Swiss-Prot record:
Species assigned in the record: Lawsonia intracellularis (strain PHE/MN1-00)
Protein name per its UniProtKB record: Acetate kinase
Cofactor field: Mg(2+); Mn(2+)
EC number(s) given by UniProt: 2.7.2.1
Active site feature: D152 (proton donor/acceptor)
Reaction(s) catalysed (UniProt annotation): acetate + ATP = acetyl phosphate + ADP
InterPro entries: Ac/propionate_kinase (IPR004372), Aliphatic_acid_kin_short-chain (IPR000890), Aliphatic_acid_kinase_CS (IPR023865), ATPase_NBD (IPR043129)
Annotated GO CC locations: cytoplasm
Highest taxon, organism lineage: Bacteria
Record HAMAP family: Acetate_kinase
Pfam annotation, one family: Acetate_kinase
GO biological process, one term: acetate metabolic process
Pathway it works in: Metabolic intermediate biosynthesis; acetyl-CoA biosynthesis; acetyl-CoA from acetate: step 1/2
Amino acid sequence: MKVLVINTGSSSFKYQLIDMPMEQVLVSGLVERIGEEVGQMVHKIYPNTSQEKKYTTTQPFSTHVEGMQAVVAELINPKHGILHSVKEIYAIGHRVVMGGETMKHPALINQHVKNIIRECAIFSPLHNLSHLAGIETAEELFPGIPNVAVFDSEFHQTMPKVAYLYPLPYDIYDDYKIRRYGFHGTSHRYVAQQTANFLNRPIKELNFITCHLGNGCSMTAIKNGKSIDTSMGLTPLDGLMMGTRCGDIDPAIVPFLIEKTEKSAKDVDELMNKQSGLKGICGMNDMRDIHEACAQGNAKAQLALDMFIYRIKKYLGAYYAILGHLDGIIFTAGIGENDTIVREKVCSGLENLGIFLDSSRNNTHSSTLRLISTDNSPIPIFVVPTNEELEIAKLTIQLVSNTQ
């Protein structure tokens, strides 16, 4: 069964065609610069295999529909297309960032679900409205094929009130549903389940702290296989220091900046989302560049790295305290999977908590799930490559199969 997985942004979208249950990626691609004078599509057949072939197209895509039409043309291309017809696609899975309190599970997309995605756009306007554009494009170009929404926030709907409520007047929650929602849920769920499989134990028996560290960063406390707390909040701005996002700050900073700098609320929001974090401290948001600058004695780069590590350690300690018992720490995403220095610094000094990193294992690069703690470490440490597209494909197949 072939599942098309789509992740739509405001001016781009990524896609994969996955053959299930073999979990073989037949096609992956990216259409970007939608709405600009010149757009680009990169379309790969059998990616990351010896059979990989890449096709690049440069042309204007005025809308998401035009971009997806170009993808369809490649999928059924008489010379190198994977499909004879788009009717071979069993289902389409869409990543949707925000599902609010209503969407606790993946959902077959109908008008009601689209209305909820639109309503939740008040908390994530750029993401949710883009996802809607992707969904409506798929409905237009793939008629009769079921579409499924998989929400970033749904995994965290198991958090208790003590974790998700903000200590504001309760009426604000009642009236506006302002609370912690959390994000990266598809990734946190996937790597936790993969680790449970590796340990050959049921996920419902296991407690993990998952660290999704990329340009966007979040951590989750998982108790008996369920999220009980997570670092991102009402929006993805909360929590850890990130590439360009500030993470936790004193809320009083916002009105202070508006008053003193005469910036608008929108300007301050942009500053916190796009000009802060690692970039705000040292001018760089790529961790590889920061490591290089640190090696050259750049004090601000070193400060940015130290602040980044410090915040992760704070959350790790806090989540250990609320979990009580820990079956593993999991690193994932771009930095978590590939950055040996960050992992070493995060784990350094935590031996009294039962966390012992094995330097040799940590410095061994691999694209597979692996243990990087010592054999006698009371708490094992894992590196687990995330695969949100595969998780979306699995959940899509499961839902569509159960409803037919």
